[in-house]
Amino acid sequence: DKIEAKKMAQKLKIPTLPMSKEPINSLKDLKKWIFLIRPPFVLKARKGGGGIGIRAINGEITIGEIFTLALGIRRQMSSAFGDTEFFLEKYLPDAKHLEVQILGDGKNFLHLFERECSLQRRFQKLLEEAPSPSVDEKLREKLIEYAISFAKALKYESVGTFEFLLDQEKNLYFMEVNPRLQVEHPVTEAITRIDLVEYQIRVAQGEKLKISQNDIKKEGWAIEARINSEDPLQNFKPSPGKIEKLVLPGGQGVFVHTFLHEGQEIFPYFDPLLAKIIGYGKTREEAITRLKRALKETVIEGVATNLPFFEILLEEKEFLEGSYTTNFIEKSKILEKLKAPKICKAFLPKKSEITE
């Protein structure tokens, strides 16, 4: 429950962005909070996730149009999560998305450092890395302080992620708690050598943590690319079909998490994630190099994928510097670069698909 989580953060003196205090249930409520918060803002589903149930309002738009968008969110949330309540929150269009991995057993609370998840499309993460290139020791201490204090207040039991936004002035704002294992857990496991899946199961069985904070060290750098069945040339439109050929990468510092096999049908009704490819190295540069190699070795035929997108992304100046933010795709020319002839070959149909 995003609203209740933010209320608890405020009680703990953890900064949050301006937001409506309760769910918006009428046009009158909507007008009130639009007047108080002002654009840019986002309409957010109270129990949404994975980029579902969120709409950004940036420019000139009527209250009636906003209300129509809100009704669309309610319909979407009813079918996806069985809940229709939403709220309004100030929007940071050029932010860093940071998160802290927490492990708790109700009495003991440990952190496994931070991750960065700023590379997104439609509010859903595409690439994650640990640690964050944007976080120095002072900021790391603040992130961890906020996350641990929140976990203690909740008497948290399980693996969980406490998510934050960082603005251009280095101000932190609590966003939400994800009380489960995240898609991006492999990058944290790579730099800490802690098996989060195992600990989630052990805590769920009632076991107490047998490690302390001193046992958790970070070493190296890990970057994960989410390989999706979607076409970047068509604004990441889903691409259903049958997997006709599959070649997965390997080698030192490369990890692959996937369920794929040749002949498998990919349907348009579910999340488009096909595989997670992780590059690990002693430094960020080495992790990037290994991820580049791994992505070049990967072959997925039968559906369009975002592999060509990552081929361009990993050469971009902002990514290499670590300065990219949540609106990087929108403000950069990266999708225009995908239209170059070299990249377009990846989207050409096979000869068997061409009819006279």
Regions found by a protein language model. Give the residues of each.
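ATP-dependent carboxylate activation and anion-phosphoryl transfer catalytic cores
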Residues: L12-K13, G50, N58, I63-E356
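A conserved helix-loop-beta module that forms one wall/lid of the active-site cleft
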Residues: D1-G48, G53
